[in-house]
Amino acid sequence: MIAPLSWLREYVDIDCTPQELEEKLFSCGFEVETLEEVGAHISRVVVGLVTSCEPIEGTHLHLCEVDCGSEGKFQICCGADNVEAGRKFPTALIGATVCETNKERSEIVGTVTIQAGRLRGYDSFGMLCSGMELGLNEDLYPGAGYNGLLVLPDDAVPGADVKPLLGLDDWLFDIAITANRPDCQGIYGISREVAAVLGKELKPLLVSYREEKVAPHTLKVDVEAPQYCPRYEAHAVKDVKIQPSPAWMRRRLSLVGVSAISNMVDITNYVMLELGQPMHAFDRRDLIGDHIVVRTAAEGEKLVTLDEQTLTLNPSNLLICDGEKPVGLAGIMGGLNSEIKETTTAVVFEAAKFARDNIRRSARALGKRTDASAHFEKGTDEYTVELAMQRALHLTEELGAGTVTDESAGQNTGNSIEKRPLTVSLARVNGVLGIEVPGEAVCRILANLAMEPELEGDALRLKIPAYREDMESYQDVAEEVIRFYGYEHLVPSFLKSAEVTSGGLSERQRRELKLKETLAGGGMYEAIHYSFFSPADLKLFRYPEGSEALRAIRILNPISEELSLMRTVLSPSMANAVMRNQKAGNLSGRLFELAKVFIPKALPLTDYPDERAHLAFAFFGKEENFFTLKGALDLAARSLHVKFRYEASIEPFTHPYQTAAVYVGNVKIGYLGKLAYDIAGELNLRTDAYLAELDLETIESLPHEQVYFTPLPKFPEVQRDLALVMAKSISCDQVVNLIRSCSPLIREVKLFDIYEGAPIPPDRKSLAFTVTFRPEEKALAPEDTDALVQQILERLRTSCDIVLRV
């Protein structure tokens, strides 16, 4: 937000330089992104009194003698139509820097340095300036909008710098407001912090006004959607006179980039900038029935907004309506049918608190992000709603814009506007900080923040202002204390609540790091995602009713709907990663992610969820297939010191004939498979994608196989290829296990061919294996190998009617 120094000084006596104030703000947690002097582009421009002004014959020019006080007297040629003797104008001396305009003098195009010149045979030693040449407009300084010279007041002292006179010595602080401090979205909120950090008194906001009694009171407010609008206030003003705002208000609005419109509209904008609370003003004549209704929109309902755009709404959008029709999109923009006009004579001011998540979703969905919606998205509070209304009514009276009546209406189903008690332990506050901050210093700091501290022994009793919704615990109090006590007082210390160790990685961290290094060494890239995903992801992956994957925890204040659920599985995120890669032109790749999923013990939450480590893979591209992904899983298995077993399986989101369940022993720990064609189509994938996901937590809980040293073989291995014919219902895994069970000399059984078709009967298939024998005591003679093969064939025939293909 932009905060002019002159505006801050209205509420705090600031006696330090702008640069020192910037450092002070940074020290208490507010980063000043830019600090800029309003007239930084202007230099060596002083007040000049024209003592003589003679026309140059045959031209539009005048030859002027200009008295610039201590700077001297100068001859200057000027072509402005309003130059005359006895008047004072901004005078740019030789070497001065001013704004350069285009030929039409309609906009500033840069800066220019003034040099001595010669016009029509006359020397000119400077330039008399217009408002635009000083970077001013009519709102920043009255008269600056005139195309001729800027006329200065009669009491301006010749030779004096014009910057203080024209407000060009003001400074603009562009302050980054963190998400937890919505109370600092306005000038007054920042002034509270400035007063606290400087140890100065905060001047009160002027909010008094006189009400004129009127009868009868017909204004009504009904909030039909209190979950989206916990507080709504409306107040009537009569005898309204629509006219331009005074110069001081127009200047402040202009300094922060807001255009002045008319007094009543400017008041609402001014209050938003000052307090961070958006407001709106309705033409009361357009409120049918003198009735304001806050409700959700009907499906397909229409509203024409102030920018003359027609919006088509749905029940997720919140509306402000009169007795018959919508008159505004709540928290975002008013309706064209109730705008303030030159003929407006009665106004209803609106101040409200709207649910930030609802405003954010509506603004994004409708493409209508405004200053008001930006403020509501960050958050407002019930206390500031009332304060803003009082301030707007005070300004109405101060500007003579209308008569404040005693007619108001509203509804508050939200938080109290009174201070709320909070008691914390001073020892715990200091425990968080790791230092001992004296109780007197703690109380002084918190008193400067209007928290009315009382310290009795270790008990620190506070009264938290309603606008500080972020203050909930002793950790929050500790943050406030150290912000103003000074981070430079912090010293390294051990956590008192934790066991002191020598540091380093835990055993689990070492295993996970080794696993990541192994996978990266295998040509895979690590993917890192948010811990959230979208409800649409779960729907796309067709998880069955009752599935653990569907028991996702909804985030109360999500970044967006696409990131509104805590992840219960990683596979949807990996599929989306493939989609993003292919959209960016990367059509092949091997990705893995090691991250936690969050499984609630019960919904709604009654306890912390189980956090389980999962490992997921996504292979995509023309060179990838089921077996390249299986190889990656085998690589992971070796790193984890386990053996994976694979069985044909079905997942709701994979190809029915290219999916396997992954087991360790008899415990299923995951799956691998080819992403189903229809899901790949929904994601607009241009190649096949293969996914896998393993539950590392379950693997960790299983007994790991012991690793023994095996000496190098003394005798050569022997291999035999067997092409076997069997029923189609028999799985490869069954055959491998049968073969392995025939002899301890069998080291490996590897499938290398699958065949179906003539001359194999239609109900049978052929699987070809390479069987590797490793003798331990003596070399295998051919007849020994033949005997082992016959033993295998006999076991296969008797067990599963599997025969050798001939």
Predicted features along the sequence, with ranges:
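Terminal amphipathic helices with adjacent charged low-complexity linkers/tails
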Residues: 198-223, 400-429
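Phosphate-backbone binding interfaces of nucleic-acid-interacting proteins
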Residues: 1-208, 348, 371, 375, ...
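Mobile "lid/hinge" segments at catalytic clefts and subdomain interfaces of large enzymes
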Residues: 120-129, 133-135, 144-149, 163, ...
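Conserved mixed alpha/beta core segments that line enzyme active sites in large multi-domain catalysts
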Residues: 33, 47-77, 158, 268-337
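Extended, well-folded interaction surfaces typified by the phenylalanyl-tRNA synthetase beta subunit core
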Residues: 189, 422-587, 720, 772-776, ...
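Glycine/proline-enriched, intrinsically flexible loops and inter-domain linkers
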Residues: 5, 23, 53-57, 198, ...
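A carboxyl-terminal module marker
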Residues: 2, 20-23, 27, 448-455, ...
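Short, hydrophobic beta-strand segments
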Residues: 2-8, 169-178, 230-238, 371-379, ...
